[in-house]
């Protein structure tokens, strides 16, 4: 379905944009610039933990997707918004930072890396709560963000997330000490995307 929508977007001249939400089974994906050595387990172990592994054409290194994580695939025409890919990534990070702020979680960006982080500058405490890996073809965006809500963080122990060996990962559940209603988070994300990019959201 995602490939079909992208194909339609690449061949359309209108200003119609798509915002896709999903929750994946256990899977590791490696971006174009990634190192295969950042997957720390064998094929046999992948089967044992019921996970799969793919090399894909997004930016970034290795990351994990799985249950309890909201993955968002915005398929936007950046030319229609008049922004660059770098500005687009900045907007995605800003949306997550605002959402976390609404839950009382202070998050920020990390210079030289994409995604949303907590406790930057605090040695031994820096951790990522949202990974971002995107690319654009003829101004149309592909891939997106992976936001840890109630994610089983044990799956991150089998990789060097996004190539970092000195930083951790976290989730909203860990930070707040309770299970989070993912439907509420999704609805907040829909509203924040609409506000940030100035469009009305139609399901």
Q: Where in the sequence are the language-model features?
A:
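Long, positively charged amphipathic alpha-helical accessory segments at protein N-termini or as interdomain linkers
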Residues: 83-130, 134-203
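N-terminal lobe of the biotin/lipoate ligase/transferase fold
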Residues: 1-126, 180
């Amino acid at each position: 379905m995602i490939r079909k929508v992208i194909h339609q977007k690449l061949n359309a001249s209108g200003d119609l944009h798509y915002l896709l939400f999903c929750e994946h089974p256990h899977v590791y994906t490696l971006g174009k610039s990634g190192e295969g050595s950042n997957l720390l387990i064998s094929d046999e172990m992948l089967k044992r933990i019921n996970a799969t592994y793919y090399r894909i054409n997004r930016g970034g290194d290795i990351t994990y997707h799985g249950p309890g994580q909201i993955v968002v695939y915005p398929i936007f025409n950046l030319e229609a918004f008049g922004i660059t890919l770098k500005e687009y990534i900045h907007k995605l990070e800003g949306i997550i930072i605002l959402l976390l702020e609404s839950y009382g979680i202070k998050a920020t960006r990390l210079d030289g890396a994409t995604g949303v982080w907590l406790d930057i500058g605090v040695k031994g405490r820096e951790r990522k709560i949202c990974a971002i890996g995107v690319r654009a073809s003829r101004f149309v965006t592909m891939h997106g963000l992976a936001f840890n809500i109630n994610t089983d963080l044990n799956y991150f122990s089998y990789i060097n997330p996004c190539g970092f060996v000195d930083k951790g990962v976290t989730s909203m559940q860990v930070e707040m000490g309770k299970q989070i209603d993912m439907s509420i988070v999704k609805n907040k994300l829909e509203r924040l995307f609409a506000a940030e990019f100035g469009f009305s959201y139609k399901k």
